């Protein structure tokens, strides 16, 4: 069974990072319906900005935790697919 890690763009411009075993469509619908009480409930509607599929939920959760520790500029570079910028941002942080 596959799993996903995803970044949602919220109505207020913020990002939400999550993971799920459900289909992305189903999970996003849950966020937008208000069924999930938490960060996104007051920031609807949300839209999918980025996702990655994993074979195991444990790998998706590990990536979710990593992404939650990233600054906004790194998340934006990932969403845009700018892998070179990600490397530069990571190197800048280590200096």
For the regions a language model picked out, list residue spans one by one.
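Short arginine-rich
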Residues: 65-78
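GIY-YIG nuclease catalytic motif and its immediate N-terminal context
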Residues: 1-37, 41-68, 83-95
